[in-house]
């Protein structure tokens, strides 16, 4: 059975320019991400700094534009000054966030020099938990100042003559989270004042930089969105972005929950835009705040216990547990655990994050930075021995390759479904989503190259879509083709590595209309070029 669907696109209906940083990634030294994937001095491909050249070369072949580093919860207890200079003089610390030892073999300079080697722009998160304004000032001076001062000359002494030129700086990480070291959960006004003063001082060191202030690190927290409002009232005119994070969970194998996940991001984005615009008017400010969704993901999760009636206690209580049996882990870069994937259709994992990017494209006028938490691993998956491609790479690669220029509005006519509210455990409870479109889409028009691309997800997990793409108004273009990616029922779990896009059969373009059959749970890319 198939369901009829129609999408209309007109190049005159523009949303806003698409920032290349929309397709960025995130890095934090958790597990083997840094000490294993990035750094392993014993690896056969290791360079003189201990970086794995196989991973660097794999990432260079992708279009990943930017990465937020070095964290993450980790930075709220990390002193960057302990990580510079000769390695034998660096201080090893406990990482309270992830209960691991941080040897600082990969330090401030290594993070930035690794980014230079990969050709990926670094976006830096400072410590505003245990750190202070002077730490931030010295960091920008060390990183970006030409020379002639203590910190800039120290950078030269340690081997980097020229400034790194980092342009985007994050004013702490998830500073509202009760799990954060030195959290500002209880005092958003004080964090807003600190962010204001820190941003001001950092920009006095380097007037070319931009800063991002933390808002609520999840729309599921009980203090959201009032915490955000209190922060923004104190620092609106001193910062350039708000830093947003959200992880949406879905029960393993539940197609309806996975395919509707991006709707929760839509609610979050719309609320934050409204909040920023309210504060703009409150401040009588000409500044239109930009958004940075710099940690996001859609992940499978098994159902756990739910303790009804304990919400107010359990939210902070979950993060205030003190287990004397829990020790600290030391990660050996040369002893990485095998990479494992959940036993489920890989298209769910692939489309979950791709749908979030489509949501960001539909708000491209305001969202200028995106950092997929698993982005580096999606772009270039690796284990101890080699790098390889996983199915989630392909939608991400299509978006990075073709999602440039201007985002266009798409009009969607299709059948819909309702998602009931659901709970997976005490901290993962989600309201219902009514009237979820089976068809999810976004479009990008690159006027410089003369290319128009329409990205389409068929969310339907049972039926194909009898699909029509109406591009009336697109004169002087020719239809370049339709690629599709899906998992056939005959494909077993061991064959998932072979899931990849291919030209779709049976797609026909007549005049300004394209007709196609969209497979269930599929990724589709329609391309037009100037004739």
Segments from the language model and where they lie:
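Non-catalytic accessory regions flanking glycosidase/transglycosidase catalytic cores in CAZymes
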Residues: 1-225, 233-241, 265-266, 270-294, ...
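Histidine/acidic-residue-rich catalytic or RNA/ligand-binding cores of hydrolases
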Residues: 302-305, 310
């Amino acid at each position: 059975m198939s369901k009829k669907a129609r999408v209309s696109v007109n190049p005159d209906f523009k949303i806003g320019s698409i920032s290349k940083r929309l397709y960025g990634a995130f890095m934090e030294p958790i597990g083997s991400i840094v000490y294993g994937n990035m750094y392993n001095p014993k690896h056969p491909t290791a360079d003189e700094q201990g970086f794995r050249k196989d991973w660097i070369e794999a990432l260079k072949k992708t279009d990943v534009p930017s990465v937020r580093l070095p964290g993450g919860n980790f930075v709220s207890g990390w002193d960057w000054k302990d990580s510079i200079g000769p390695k034998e003089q660096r201080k090893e610390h406990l990482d309270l966030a992830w209960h691991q030892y941080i040897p600082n073999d990969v330090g401030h300079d290594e993070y930035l020099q690794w980014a230079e080697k990969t050709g990926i722009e670094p976006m830096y998160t400072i410590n505003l938990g245990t750190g202070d304004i002077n730490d931030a000032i010295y960091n920008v001076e060390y990183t970006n100042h030409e020379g002639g001062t203590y910190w800039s000359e120290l950078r030269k002494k340690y081997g980097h003559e020229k400034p790194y030129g980092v342009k985007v700086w994050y004013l702490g990480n998830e500073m509202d989270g009760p799990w954060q070291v030195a959290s500002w959960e209880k005092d958003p006004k004080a964090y807003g004042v600190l962010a204001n003063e820190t941003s001001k001082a950092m920009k006095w060191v380097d007037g070319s930089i931009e800063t991002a202030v933390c808002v609520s690190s999840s729309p599921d927290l009980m203090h959201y969105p009032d915490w955000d409002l209190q922060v923004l009232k104190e620092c609106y005119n001193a910062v350039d972005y708000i830093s947003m994070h959200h992880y949406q969970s879905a029960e393993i194998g539940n197609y309806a929950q996975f395919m509707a996940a991006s709707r929760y991001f839509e609610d979050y984005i719309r609320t934050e835009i409204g909040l920023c615009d309210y504060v703009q008017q409150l401040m009588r400010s000409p500044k239109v705040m930009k958004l940075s969704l710099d940690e996001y993901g859609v992940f499978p999760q098994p159902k756990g216990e739910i303790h009804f009636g304990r919400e107010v206690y359990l939210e902070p209580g979950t993060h205030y547990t003190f287990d004397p049996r829990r020790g600290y882990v030391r990660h050996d870069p040369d002893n990485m655990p095998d990479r494992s994937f959940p036993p489920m259709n890989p298209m769910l994992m692939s489309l979950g994050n791709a749908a979030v990017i489509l949501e960001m494209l539909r708000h491209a006028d305001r969202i200028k930075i995106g950092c997929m938490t698993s982005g580096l691993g999606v772009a270039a998956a690796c284990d101890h021995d080699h790098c390889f491609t996983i199915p989630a790479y392909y939608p991400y690669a299509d978006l990075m390759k073709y999602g440039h220029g201007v985002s266009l509005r798409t009009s969607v006519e299709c059948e819909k479904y309702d998602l009931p509210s659901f709970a997976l455990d005490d901290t993962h409870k989600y309201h219902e989503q009514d009237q979820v479109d089976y068809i999810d889409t976004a479009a990008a028009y690159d006027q410089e190259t003369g290319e128009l691309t329409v990205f389409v997800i068929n969310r339907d997990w049972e039926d194909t879509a009898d699909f029509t793409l109406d591009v009336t108004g697109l004169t002087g273009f020719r239809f370049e083709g339709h690629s599709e990616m899906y998992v056939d029922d005959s494909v077993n779990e061991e064959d998932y590595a072979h899931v990849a896009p291919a030209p779709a059969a049976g797609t026909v373009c007549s005049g300004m209309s394209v007709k196609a059959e969209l497979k269930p749970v599929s990724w589709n890319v329609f391309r037009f070029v100037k004739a």
